[in-house]
């Protein structure tokens, strides 16, 4: 009887992928990128091993939101001081911090814990179409849908 081969750190081959966020919807892009970071697009996916690829997202400032989310969606953070609850609308986030907006959406879709933090480190988000990872020879990745 043959057993299912399990991936381990020495057998994983990681690729570098470039995803263009221009005109894409935030949630649809984020869920696909989270699956790539986890390695679910590979036949060698193993839940307890980080089998995912590196992802570079460009044109983060051109991400789209549907409906009235630009004005109604609010991002909260706390300074850890009394009365330190801060809030920003999605429009302010997209204008001033588009990288953070994408990172927060993708981070929420990854596993919580040390494996999820390790997967999140393989994500690179940039405003504009330039990125400093040309030496890794990234492949352009076309999203489904």
Swiss-Prot record:
Entry superkingdom: Bacteria
Keywords noted in UniProt: Ribonucleoprotein, Ribosomal protein
Gene3D superfamilies in alphabetical order: Ribosomal protein L13
One example of a Gene Ontology biological process annotation: negative regulation of translation
GO cellular component, as recorded: cytosolic large ribosomal subunit; ribosome
Gene Ontology molecular-function annotations: mRNA binding; structural constituent of ribosome
Any Pfam family: Ribosomal_L13
PROSITE patterns the record matches: RIBOSOMAL_L13
Cystine pairs: none
Alphabetical list of PANTHER family matching this protein: LARGE RIBOSOMAL SUBUNIT PROTEIN UL13M, RIBOSOMAL PROTEIN L13
Protein role: This protein is one of the early assembly proteins of the 50S ribosomal subunit, although it is not seen to bind rRNA by itself. It is important during the early stages of 50S assembly.
Oligomer and partners: Part of the 50S ribosomal subunit. Binds to Obg (AC P20964).
Family classification: Belongs to the universal ribosomal protein uL13 family.
UniProt protein name: Large ribosomal subunit protein uL13
